[in-house]
Amino acid sequence: MEQTFSDMSVQMAVERAGASELVMMVAKDVHDVLRPNEFVLEFADTTSPGFHSALAVTNYRMLIGVGPGQLQEIAVDSVTRVDAVRAPEVTLLVRVYNADVTVYGLGDRGLRRIFHAFNWIVSQNAARPAHADPENSIADMYNEWIDVQRFLHENPDVSDEEGNQRLAGMVANKRWW
């Protein structure tokens, strides 16, 4: 296949996905929005947005083509679980904190590639450096924790979901580790 993209991660992922016309269209959109130090791990065909499209997994985001020049974005840092359901059709269930994102129409091959990409991301996140200098100190984390607790006690009408989101957002903040 001739080289279409200047970013080799996009080029190689497109080739692995089969380089269909729709994958190429979404790949161009993904190529245009790549951030510094971001690279594409895999592409796969999907029918998730209600029509034939493609899904990309990068080292930072999952991107689904939802229209010409439009991508739905899910930060991989917010993904807490990835599951597959094979009946009645192959479906990818991506758990984002307390919500599920369902991706339909991947096919077995696409599902395997997307799972492989997520497994790589998990393995990289699990292999944290032995020594890290967090942006903020333990005292800062404690103070933010107290602020969240104070807010929850001063606002008893806050729903459990909102309270959980505030706590999860504070704990998941990568400045702490």
Regions found by a protein language model. Name each.
Residues 50-64:
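Polybasic phosphoinositide-binding surfaces of eukaryotic membrane-targeting domains
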Residues 2-31, 45-50, 66-177:
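Acidic, Ser/Thr- and proline-rich intrinsically disordered linker/docking segments
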